[in-house]
Amino acid sequence: KDCGEPAYLALRQQHWNCEFETSFIPHFCKESDCAGIAMVQSNENHLRAECYPQDSGVKLVVSLCKDGEDSCLAQMDLPAALPIKLKLRVEGLVASVLYQSNSEWKPVISDIDLRSLSTEHAGGFVGCTLGLYASGNGEDAGGYSDFERMTYRELPTN
C-alpha cells in the first residue's frame, strides 16, 4: 500500500494452487519499519502479511487492501525466535497465512477471500505476483531485513 518506495521482490503467480514461503531476520530501527510477504495485483488490491517491531518481539499483521482500502484481517504476536518463517498458501480464490514455530506450520488466518485480486474485479491482464516485502510505511526506513530464502511451489489439485 506504501506508494512511496517499498521494497518488493516477486514472482508471477503461475498456478491456481500454490505456496510461497520465506525465511528472514528483521533488523528494525523504527516502529514504522515492516517486512514480510505480499500477494499483489495492484497498489489498490493486494494482500500483505507484515511483521512490525514491538517491545516483546514481533507483531504479525495480515491486511487485505481492496479498492485502495485496507482492512486488518488478523494480528498476533510471534515468538521471539529468529528467523521468522512465513507462508502464503493459495487455493483458487482462497488464501491462508501461516508461520512456523518449533518446526510446525501454524495458521494465522485461513479462508481469505481473494476475489478482489482477480482480474475480473481489479482489471489488468497480468494477474498476481507473490513476493518479499519491506517498507518504512511512508517514512525513511531505518532498518532492513535479511531474507534468507524464498520458495514458490505448485500445490497438487484435489
Feature map (PLM): residue ranges:
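Extracellular glycan-recognition regions
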Residues: 1-158
